[in-house]
A protein has these predicted regions:
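Helicase-associated low-complexity/disordered flanking segments
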Residues: 1-77, 83-87, 112-127, 344, ...
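Walker A/P-loop NTP-binding motif
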Residues: 77-82, 98-133, 235-240
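Conserved C-terminal RecA-like helicase domain
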Residues: 117, 133, 141, 157-168, ...
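Conserved nucleic-acid-binding Ia/Ib motif block in the N-terminal RecA-like helicase ATPase lobe
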Residues: 121-193, 265, 389
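Conserved motor-coupling elements within RecA-like helicase/translocase cores
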Residues: 173-188, 396-412
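SF2 helicase catalytic motif II
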Residues: 191-195, 202-244
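Conserved interdomain linker/interface between the two RecA-like ATPase lobes of SF2 helicase motors
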Residues: 249-341, 388
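A short beta-strand element within the Helicase C-terminal
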Residues: 413, 420-437
């Protein structure tokens, strides 16, 4: 039947379920299904922005695309055509990094000669030549995690290489010398690190003074423990704008936020010009969500066995249909335990062959050699049966190997922790999140996952 009303989590947060939600009761578990949201209808004025119609600066940077996607096309006139502050709240996979790239190109265009629009007559086959005043500006991109920072650096560095623009990471792991900072135009950093840089009144004033654009990715984390740091950064930037009459553009990117109006006010966004909110109807790939609750007291061996069984039933059904599945767990040691439990269930049920990689692909020698070299015994054992694990405690080389095996289809089921979700885009048809409580070391207790996680 349908479900109405609000539900309280055990921590007092209210949740409401969307219309059309169905609930099914089984002997040992119950399941709530949230249907796919209907795609948002197209507005009659909506036209995709074609790359060939852009000026040479954008055209050459977005060269491998033919057009911007739906959300990017709607936001393009504001992102690239104005200096308005922006808050973009959109579903995952909406191409927010490219919207940020449009605002970066807007900043670069202001320090380019000749001006990009003066070269619009250039035919599309000719590579434009720009001289960029490299030392005149800095662009700061604040990413929530180091893993994401590395991914953003790689993307922007390769896209903007043709202009000679340097993009570097400045995080707890990656320090930059003064000379490197001076030679870099785009600095990708974490909230905590940028807080340290801007906090020192006598510190890097040259660096801070040259900032023309501040992009805050995953700004919905304002709600989490680290929100205060992000809040401080933004307030400090706004104070700098007022005190020095300098022009710094603020761009916030987030998942679909409930309180987007508050966040946009805080960012100083003009709600009629710079506020863009897209709901789940704009997801490029529709998402159907199933919440499965297992009976019994959470954390007891009996409940855990039941959880593994229900998890296996799901995974086996998906793999039998030819799909790859990622199973997220909340502790490193659980990755191995869950993978082994799923494999054991498959052996008992006689379905293990469905999980094994196809014979013809199992002989990729280059990868086989790398697997043989790995010291991770548990990982190697599981790989034979098409299972694998991924968590931050593994060696970088092993993690990269697992990612490659999964993207080539040689691993059917990957048990991993959330570090994988933050920084790596792997092509899974379905994602299973096993258990909804994580250990919070600051509270010294298990807490519910936030719905954004």
């Amino acid at each position: 039947g349908g479900l109405g009303g609000n539900m309280l989590s055990m921590f007092g947060s209210k949740y409401a379920l969307p219309m059309g939600t169905a609930r099914d009761e089984f002997a040992d578990h119950e399941e709530i299904t949230i249907p796919i949201s209907t795609p948002a209808p197209r507005h009659y004025t909506e036209e995709p922005v074609l790359i060939e119609d852009m000026d040479p600066l954008c055209r050459y940077t977005f060269g491998k695309y033919t057009s911007l996607n739906r959300i990017q096309s709607i936001i393009y006139p504001t992102a690239y055509g104005t200096n308005e502050n922006i808050l973009l709240s959109a579903p995952t996979g909406a191409g927010k990094t490219d919207v940020a790239l449009l605002t970066i190109l807007r900043t670069i265009a202001q320090f380019c000669s000749p001006a990009p629009r003066d070269l619009e007559w250039l035919d599309t086959s000719t590579k434009p030549k720009f001289t960029v005043a490299m030392s005149e500006f800095k662009i700061i991109y604040v990413a929530p995690m180091k893993a994401l920072a590395a991914e953003v650096v790689e993307k922007y560095q390769s896209r903007l290489k043709w202009l000679g623009i340097q993009c570097r990471e400045l995080t707890g792991d990656m320090q930059l010398t003064k000379a490197e900072v001076n030679a870099t135009q785009i600095i990708v950093t974490t909230p905590e690190k940028w807080d340290v840089v801007t906090r020192k009144s006598s510190g890097d004033t040259e660096l801070v003074d040259r900032v023309k654009l501040l992009i805050v990715d995953e700004i919905h984390l304002l709600n989490e423990d680290r929100g205060s740091v992000i809040e401080t950064l933004i307030a400090r930037t706004q104070r700098q704008v007022e005190a020095r009459q300098s022009m710094i553009r603020l761009v916030g990117l987030s998942a679909t936020l409930p309180n987007y109006v508050d966040v946009s006010n805080f960012l100083g966004v003009n709600p009629y010009k710079g506020l863009f909110y897209f709901d789940a109807g704009y997801r490029p790939v529709p998402l159907e969500q199933h919440f499965v609750g297992v009976h019994g007291k959470a954390g007891t061996p009996a409940a855990n066995r039941l959880l593994n069984r229900v998890c296996y039933d799901r995974v086996q059904r998906l793999v039998a249909e030819g799909n790859q599945v990622m199973v997220f767990v909340h502790a490193r040691k659980d990755t191995v335990k869950t993978a082994q439990a799923l494999r054991d269930h498959a052996m008992t049920d006689g379905t293990l062959d469905q999980f094994k990689p196809p014979e013809d692909t199992a002989t990729d020698l280059r990868l086989t050699g790398r697997v043989a070299k790995s010291q991770n015994r548990e990982m190697k054992e599981l790989l034979n049966d098409g299972f694998s694990i991924h968590h931050a405690g593994m060696l970088r080389s092993d993690r990269n190997l697992v990612e490659e095996l999964f993207s080539k289809g040689l691993v059917r089921v990957l048990c991993c922790t959330s570090t994988l979700a933050w920084g790596v885009n792997l092509p899974a048809y379905a994602v299973v999140i096993k258990g909804t409580q994580v250990y919070d070391s600051q509270k010294g207790a298990f807490v519910d996952l936030s719905i954004l996680d």
